[in-house]
Swiss-Prot record:
Pathway: Glycan metabolism; osmoregulated periplasmic glucan (OPG) biosynthesis. The chain crosses the membrane at residues 1-21, 26-46, 77-97, 108-128. It is an enzyme of class 2 (transferase). InterPro entries: Alkaline_phosphatase_core_sf, DUF7024, OpgB, OpgB/LTA_synthase_biosynth, Sulfatase_N. It is a multi-pass membrane protein. The gene is mdoB. It holds the Pfam family DUF7024. PANTHER family: LIPOTEICHOIC ACID SYNTHASE, PHOSPHOGLYCEROL TRANSFERASE I. Belongs to the OpgB family. It is found in: Cell inner membrane. GO terms for cellular component: plasma membrane. This is Phosphoglycerol transferase I. It comes from Escherichia coli O81 (strain ED1a). HAMAP family: MdoB_OpgB (MF_01070). Keywords: Cell inner membrane, Cell membrane, Membrane, Transferase, Transmembrane, Transmembrane helix. The lineage of its organism: Bacteria, Pseudomonadati, Pseudomonadota, Gammaproteobacteria, Enterobacterales.
Length: 763
């Protein structure tokens, strides 16, 4: 209803101003600004829905001040460009319409009415309401009743008798199991769901709407609200360190806790969370690659679900035979947005909807078959009678190719339980949320029936039942939940441990690199993650007087304040204000101690603008003084005009990447010498080893042969035509996820370059 009212007010404002208000520059500018705000808000809502499937939420608020990089982002580039172009077109059209009768005399009454209607359209828009609520949630002090509802359970289960298998289905919400809406989509897992305790109304709350947040909610009974963006949790050394979570209780009760997934454990700090709360045995893509049957059988995120669930079954067998009490948690990935992935062993590889194949539905149908196969193995085993199996979604599906069809349904998260000791077949329609999952499992295992804000759906009353406005209530509790981190409010001294790549201050520890905004009563950590912008881009958003401490590789800050360190990959510490003074210190000891030293100086806005502009220079446009191209730092020597076909810097150098260009091309600002030696320090990837690699300068071509290890080769060139471009053509680029950023499409690697140097020859 509010959408219709908002649009009606917008349309009325446009028509009244265009046809009645007449000519006045001030009223035109004011009305266009407010109407433009309406357009921006609604496009933001549309774009947010596209990325999150949940409107403007905490993740979007973070992204508005940073950058969305990371998982699958390349698939969103075209929609993003479309939104920008559409916004420009709408603004242009809006300005043209409002000035249709600019030659008519100004009418104050109609101008005022049009402006008021425009303001009303903004106020009534859902986007404005969502942003207002989010901003309020950032500034609240908390809610006094939080302590009454947040309850810590007993740290042990008195007499545990059952093992636990807990399966997180990536984005595998219960909506997919509606056979009327999506016929025969989930027959195998749906049949198992109907054999157990099926909780049909598990809603999603703020702070529980992405994987690590859903895991925290289901195991600790609280949303993931933190003093930093949730997916940046990989940078912290401990996770809600004061809280008691399901894993802690299981460990204290004699359980050995295991976690198995196909993706890298470091992503979003799942390893930190699990290690902080009772899990001693973790298996992700790095740990599994040496034990799986086919280490090359991977998707963009890691190993396929069939591989992961096969390993989970092996672990279940091994642990069951040992006779020890255990919990085995596993997380699938094949149903990850935007398209999903199809395991090669499943029979259900294709699902048509609306008369055409749908990749997301196909991935769901395949993944549920793999999960069902795993569960049926457990059910057929002699150990099932001592086992509780839990299947849940980590969160509702985000914007995938099935999302518009899901949105036509009443959407809920998946949560069902199959008990080997006491078979129960029932659908429970009680209102609940993800935070109740852990408490329900704890209750079944013989522990308390509460866990944080979660309550057992078998013997307690969910917050979703107590509060009709549970989403608003959850946001009201956000400051209280953030305080559970016990995060420090000041930073005076700090220590950097180079061996561990950690910084410590005021009792807190963070992985490097790290950016901190330091004020009188608050220290705000801004880690670097797959979903956040590089730290220098985040620093560029600081105000001129904001105090900062930035710990990163020296070369990243050298272009601003320490050019002598432009080629150093050591750690450096920079601190100060962007509009004031900055210092850079080289971390030259294994354990390096520093102090914050912020001076109250006069702010220089010209200096501030220069710093911001330099921080925002993209990597490929950075230039440094050097007599060779050093590939393990960003940018290129000053003599290089541009380059292409080269991937990002890594600790050792850079790979060529045929996704960015079939050949490595380095164009210099001036012609290369008439005679020169080209000294190349490099290695080859895969089948490119021991193969002739053409290297061209102008009309002359030499051959380079590389092995799998780094070697240095000198090629002799004559350049009578004054060519200015060096071209290297890897013969057989290999598509691989090796060394890739999690969730990105595979790179096509050819050669790995450490250094290229042009040495002029006499004669």
């Amino acid at each position: 209803m509010s959408e219709l009212l908002s649009f009606a007010l917008f349309l009325a404002s446009v028509l009244i101003y265009a046809w009645k208000a007449g000519r006045n520059t001030w009223w035109f500018a004011a009305t266009l600004t407010v109407l433009g705000l309406f357009v921006v808000l609604n496009i933001t809502l549309f774009a947010s829905d596209y990325f999150t499937g949940d409107g403007i939420n905490d993740a979007v608020l973070y992204t508005l001040t940073n950058s969305l990089t990371g998982a699958g982002v390349s698939k969103y580039i075209l929609p993003g460009i479309g939104i920008v172009l559409g916004l420009a077109a709408v603004f242009g059209a809006l300005g043209w319409i409002l000035r249709r009768r600019r030659h008519h005399p100004h009418h104050f009454g109609y101008s005022l009415l049009a402006l008021l209607l425009a303001l009303g359209s903004v106020d009534a828009s859902p986007a404005f309401r969502q942003i207002t609520e989010l901003v309020k949630s950032q500034s609240r002090d908390g809610d006094p009743d939080f302590a009454a509802y947040y309850k810590e359970p007993s740290r042990t289960i008195p007499d545990p008798k059952l093992n636990l298998v807990y399966i997180y289905g990536e984005s595998l919400e219960r909506t997919y199991f509606d056979n009327e809406a999506f016929p025969d989509l989930t027959p195998e897992l749906g049949a198992l769901k109907n054999e157990g305790l099926d909780f049909s109304h598990t809603q999603q709350l703020p702070g529980t709407d992405y994987t690590i947040a859903g895991m925290v909610a289901s195991q600790c009974g609280i949303p993931l609200f933190a003093p930093f963006e949730g997916n940046a949790s990989a940078s912290v050394s401990s996770f809600f360190p004061q809280n008691i979570c399901l894993g802690d209780i299981l460990k204290n009760s004699g359980y050995q806790n295991y976690f198995v997934q196909g993706a890298n454990l470091r992503f979003a700090g799942k390893d930190v969370f699990l290690k902080s709360h009772g899990f001693d045995h973790l298996y992700g893509s790095e740990e599994l690659k040496s034990v799986v049957a086919d280490p090359h059988y991977r998707n963009d995120w890691g190993f396929y679900d069939d591989t992961v669930l096969d390993e989970a079954w092996k672990k279940f067998e091994e642990l069951s035979r040992s006779g020890q009490r255990f919990s085995l948690f596993t997380l699938t990935v094949d149903t990850h947005h935007p398209d999903g992935f199809i395991s090669r062993t499943c029979n259900r590889k294709k699902y048509d909807f609306d008369g055409k194949p749908n990749q997301s539905f196909s991935a769901v149908s395949c993944s549920q078959e793999n999960i069902a196969t795993f569960i049926n193995k457990i059910k057929a085993s002699p150990w099932f009678k001592d086992t509780v199996i839990v299947v849940s979604s980590d969160h509702l599906a985000m914007n995938n190719t099935a999302w518009k069809y899901l949105n036509k349904q009443d959407r809920n998260n998946l949560f069902f339980v199959i008990r080997g000791d006491k078979p129960q077949q029932e659908t429970l329609a009680v209102k609940r949320n993800t935070m109740d999952n852990g408490a329900t499992v704890l209750d079944i295992l013989g522990g308390d029936n509460y866990l944080g804000l979660g309550r057992s759906s078998l013997s307690g009353q969910s917050m979703s039942e107590i509060f009709l406005n549970i989403k608003e209530k959850t946001l009201a509790w956000k400051p209280d939940i953030i305080r559970l981190w016990k995060f420090p409010k000041e930073m005076k001294e700090f220590t950097i441990d180079q061996q561990k790549n950690m910084i410590a201050f005021s009792g807190s520890h963070f992985r490097l690199p790290l950016l901190l905004r330091v004020s009188d009563k608050r220290v705000e950590p801004l880690p670097e993650s797959e979903y956040s912008a590089p730290l220098r881009f985040q620093l560029a958003d600081f105000a001129p007087r904001d105090n900062f401490v930035w710990v990163d590789r020296c070369y990243k800050m050298a272009q601003l304040w320490a050019p002598e360190l432009a080629l150093s990959t050591d750690w450096c510490v920079s601190q100060g204000q962007l509009g004031g003074q900055q210092i850079v210190q080289h971390v030259d000891k294994a354990i390096w101690k520093g102090k914050t030293a912020f001076k109250d100086t006069v702010i220089d806005m010209a200096r501030y603008k220069g710093n911001v502009d330099t921080l925002k220079i993209v990597d490929n446009d950075i230039r440094y003084k050097a007599d060779s191209f050093i590939f393990n730092v960003a940018g290129a020597p000053e003599e290089v005009k541009q380059f292409s076909g080269i991937s990002r810097p890594e600790s050792w150098g850079r790979w060529s990447n045929a996704q960015l260009g079939d050949e490595v091309k380095i164009e210099y600002k001036h012609p290369l010498p008439k005679k020169f030696d080209l000294v190349i320090t490099a290695k080859a990837y895969g089948n490119n080893a021991s193969r002739p690699i053409p290297v061209r300068v102008g009309n002359e071509e030499q051959t380079l042969v590389l092995g799998n290890e780094v070697t240095t080769t000198t090629l002799h060139f004559d350049n009578p035509t004054d060519a200015d471009t060096l071209v290297i053509v890897p013969p057989e680029p290999v598509s691989t996820n090796e060394g890739n950023i999690l969730g990105h499409s595979p790179r096509k690697l050819g050669i790995g370059m450490v250094e290229i140097k042009v040495v002029e020859r006499e004669g």
